[in-house]
A protein has these predicted regions:
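Positively charged n-region of N-terminal signal peptides that target proteins for export
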Residues: 1-4
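Membrane-embedded alpha-helical bundles that constitute the cytochrome b-like, heme-associated redox core
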Residues: 6, 34-42, 162, 225, ...
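Hydrophobic membrane-insertion alpha-helices, especially the h-region
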Residues: 7-20
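N-terminal, intrinsically disordered, polar/charged segments of Gram-positive cell-envelope systems
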Residues: 24-75
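Domain-level detector of nuclease and nuclease-like folds
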Residues: 67-232
Length: 232
């Protein structure tokens, strides 16, 4: 997507250089067209891992001042499962004292849409994906904290951002406000993706706001049921 937008900008710039007659109003109109095109492309379905992570709001989280308060100390809260047994938003005020020291137990929860398949490379298509990663709080076989996600959705995508948080917590001893919002649409059993937000409290050392698309390159997922097929 970034290549497409860059191409549009280069094309417009080349026209401007070629004719050298753009007026301020025309420049504003062209900028508006580019912005509109970017928004339209951002709304389109992303099918490849190269487009799996999308930066939101210029990578700035949208927490309120109340959200960032340390009045309640360290905590984590999970939403109740909905009528379809789907997970909801998960929130936490993280600190390294919450991080586990024991080895993780084997996962056995089967989240909604769990229709496992072995891929051509021998890996399994689906992972049980934590909303709040085990390495951050030690929360394991909690059905309110596990969703069905593709292998590339889980790792490297989600895990990369979880690792950023974990490394910051260990290094600084500071707090991090954390939020993960799974993106279920209609009555679909598999989320289209998840938004991950983090903001360090005592300093500005960590901050991100990304949307990770629940896709796997080479496969088409039926988000309604969790079924999948090889992409033609």
């Amino acid at each position: 997507m970034k290549k497409i937008i860059s191409g549009i900008v280069v094309f417009i710039g080349a026209i401007g250089i070629g004719i050298g007659v753009f007026q301020p109003q025309e420049v504003r109109q062209i900028t508006s067209i580019v912005d509109q095109t970017f928004n339209e492309l951002s709304d389109k379905k992303v099918e490849h891992t190269s487009d799996q992570v999308e930066v939101k709001n210029h990578n700035k989280p949208t927490f309120s001042s109340k959200d960032l308060s340390l009045d309640k100390g360290n905590w984590q809260v999970f939403s109740d499962l909905d009528s379809l047994n789907r997970v909801g938003e998960a929130n936490a005020m993280l600190h390294k004292s919450m991080m586990p020291t024991e080895e993780r137990e084997r996962l056995y929860i089967k989240p909604t849409g769990w229709k496992q398949k072995k891929m051509k490379n021998g890996d399994y298509l689906y992972n049980r994906c934590y909303l709040i990663g085990y390495q951050l709080t030690g929360e394991n076989n909690n059905p309110r904290n596990l969703m069905t996600g593709t292998r590339s959705f889980n790792t490297p995508a989600m895990v990369e951002y979880e690792n950023k948080v974990a490394e910051y917590l260990r290094r600084t001893g500071n707090h991090v406000r954390y939020r993960v919002r799974p993106d279920f649409r209609g009555n679909e059993l598999v989320a289209r993706g998840a938004q991950m937000e983090a903001q360090s409290i005592e300093d500005n050392g960590l901050s991100f706001n990304v949307y990770i698309h629940n896709t796997q390159e080479g496969y088409v997922i039926d988000y309604q049921t969790g079924s999948s097929r090889v992409q033609n």
